[in-house]
Regions:
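TPR alpha-solenoid repeat register
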Residues: 29-32, 66, 100, 134, ...
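Conserved structural position within tetratricopeptide repeats
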Residues: 18-24, 54-58, 88-92, 122-126, ...
Length: 244
C-alpha cells in the first residue's frame, strides 16, 4: 500500500477507536469493530484484526459474517482448530451456509476425517450442485480415499464444462500419477502449463514425476522453475539433492 493510503487507514482506525470510547455500549460497535478488522486484515495485521473481530463478536456473538471473517483469518494463520470452531458456530446459526460447509469440509480433510468431510461436501453440493470448489474438494477427497475412478469422473465432467482451467488439469494429473498413468499425467501437465505458464504447482508435480522416472535433468529444470515462481527453495531441498 502507498504511504498515503496507509495514513488514511491509520486515521480511520483512530476515528473508529474514538467512536468506540464515546459509546462503549452501543450495539453498532460490532459493525465498527468489524470494519476495523477488515482494514487491519488488508494491511496484513492479522493479530490486530483477530482482536477487532473478537471484540465485535462480544457485541454480536452470533453474527455470521463476522464469524466467517474471523475464521478466514484463522485459516490464513494456520490456526485451523480455531477456524473450525467458528465455522461450526456459523453452521449452528445457518445450516445452509455454503462457505462454512466448504471450509469445514476442507478442515476435515486436513484432519483425515474423511467421512465427516464427505457429509459436508454432499450438503454443499445439494445446495449448489455446480459449486466449483465443492466439486473439486470432493474430487480431492475421493483421491485421498483411493477412489481414483470416482475422482476422475468428477474432474472429467468439470473439464468438459471448463476446458481452459489449468487447475483442473493439474488435479487430474495428480490422480493419474497415483494411478501410475504417468504418461497421461504429463500430457495434462503440458496442457496446464500451456494454459497457465505461471503455475508453480504444474512444474512441481511434473518435476516429481520426472524424478520418479529418473529423468533428473528434466526434474531439476522443473523444480528450479517452480522456485522461480514462488515455491520456497527449502521445500525442494530433498528433491534437488536427488537430482544430482
Amino acid at each position: 500500500l502507498s504511504i498515503r493510503r496507509q495514513r488514511q487507514m491509520c486515521i480511520r482506525d483512530r476515528l473508529l477507536l474514538q467512536a468506540l470510547k464515546l459509546e462503549p455500549k452501543n450495539a453498532k460497535n460490532a459493525l465498527l469493530f468489524s470494519n476495523l478488522g477488515l482494514v487491519q486484515r488488508r494491511l496484513g495485521e492479522f493479530d490486530k484484526a483477530l482482536e477487532s473481530y473478537s471484540f465485535a463478536l462480544n457485541f454480536a456473538p452470533l453474527a455470521v459474517p463476522i464469524l466467517l471473517d474471523r475464521a478466514a483469518i484463522y485459516m490464513e494463520m494456520g490456526k485451523t482448530d480455531r477456524a473450525y470452531t467458528d465455522y461450526c458456530q456459523v453452521l449452528d446459526e445457518d445450516k445452509q451456509n455454503k462457505e462454512a460447509l466448504l471450509m469445514r469440509a476442507y478442515i476435515y480433510v486436513l484432519r483425515r476425517d474423511y467421512p465427516a468431510a464427505r457429509i459436508d461436501y454432499n450438503r454443499l453440493l445439494e445446495l449448489d450442485p455446480q459449486s466449483y470448489s465443492g466439486r473439486l474438494g470432493l474430487a480431492t477427497l475421493e483421491q485421498k480415499e483411493g477412489k481414483f475412478r470416482e475422482a476422475l469422473e468428477i474432474l472429467n465432467k468439470m473439464l468438459a464444462a471448463t476446458p481452459e482451467d489449468a487447475t483442473l488439469y493439474i488435479a487430474r494429473a495428480d490422480v493419474e500419477r497415483e494411478m501410475k498413468h504417468e504418461d497421461l499425467a504429463l500430457v495434462d501437465l503440458e496442457e496446464a502449463i500451456r494454459l497457465d505458464a505461471a503455475s508453480a504447482d504444474a512444474y512441481l508435480l511434473r518435476g516429481n514425476i520426472y524424478l520418479a522416472q529418473k529423468k533428473k535433468g528434466l526434474a531439476k529444470a522443473d523444480f528450479e522453475k517452480a522456485i522461480s515462481l514462488g515455491v520456497p527453495p527449502a521445500d525442494l531441498h530433498e528433491q534437488l539433492r536427488q537430482c544430482k
